[in-house]
């Protein structure tokens, strides 16, 4: 009886370890080879989240972590680096003080930003991670966040 229980527990542990290894070593999604869900103007994307956050979240974001791949077009308002050394481009309407779209590049695609200057019109492909938000009580704004970005044009 004890050997049957021991064998059953061993089989369950082996299956669990196999599943964990499968999940751990599964290849990451290649955003640049994935077909884009839509091409959107940066200001239009921000306005969608500000007008109806729930509808925009349902359209662009996925609770399972497979958020949509978008191509965002807009005017470069700012170029910076984050704490990890990844370059970040803020796409924003120059005449608008509202939020914009923050596009974070990977270390592999950082070099694509070298020839881009503030004021340029660009198309950037990436995964949307968060929508624009405005907190009236604290007067705080949050840009739309696009990760794993790459310049298209």
Regions found by a protein language model. Give the residues of each.
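OB-fold and OB-like single-stranded nucleic-acid-recognition modules
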Residues: 2-153
